[in-house]
Amino acid sequence: EGGATISASEYFRRLCQKITVALSEFTSEGYVYRVDLRLRPEGAAGNIAYSLDGFERYYQSRGETWERLALLKAWPVAGDRALGRRFLEMARPFIYDQPFDLKALEEVRGIKRKIDRRMSTKQQGRGQRARNVKLGAGGIREIELIVQTLQVPYGGRTPQIRERNTMKALGALRDQSLISAEECETLSSAYVFLRDVENKLQMVDDAQTHSLPIDGQELTACARRLGYVDNELSAAAEQFLRDYRRHTGQVNRIFEDIFGASEPSRFSQSIR
């Protein structure tokens, strides 16, 4: 810009912002995907671009439990792959080697309580909150929390469970006897079902929604996109809601059994 020089940090901040716009801007051809930059050190108030040393200093001094969970999904997808691998190596001790005690478990419970409060504010009434595929009771986020909160404390000495893919991680947790075969089957089946529901909801107008329609016709249309059909016994929407409640109910029961606030939970006993 007119021969002016800028710092490397400022250069990469601007570059990241432009890439984010290019990926998430909605055009006549749609968009690539939505980008959320809030999952970075200091959140929305933090720098967009950090040096590797900057990341390491932050994680060693101020890293939080939720960031340990989030980093389980980290993977280099573009640019300098060698630098990406160095980042993963740097982050590994922060994820797996720090203690995961009852305080950390309470922080995970706090994450869930925060989600529940936000849902209560956005969607009044227990019935409406239950219709949120991602954040509602027994939804996608509870499955992910189950997986990630087991991976962090046990992944240090059991590298077999360090899987980024949720379905593969569930199988690995089963193989290491951290969840039962029945729990693995229940959670895997629910995860596939709920992700399918999420996709069918969002394919309409590329909407970023996770809530089941309230309107009866829209709910029926969603059920039919999922393959449900009316029969002599029940309508497509009724069949879909029955399966939805079964899956989410089973997930929530497993979540509460492992991490529930009532002590002693199954997980709290294992980390004492």
What would you call each of these model-derived segments?
Residues E1-R272:
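A nucleotide- and high-energy phosphate-metabolite-utilizing enzyme signature
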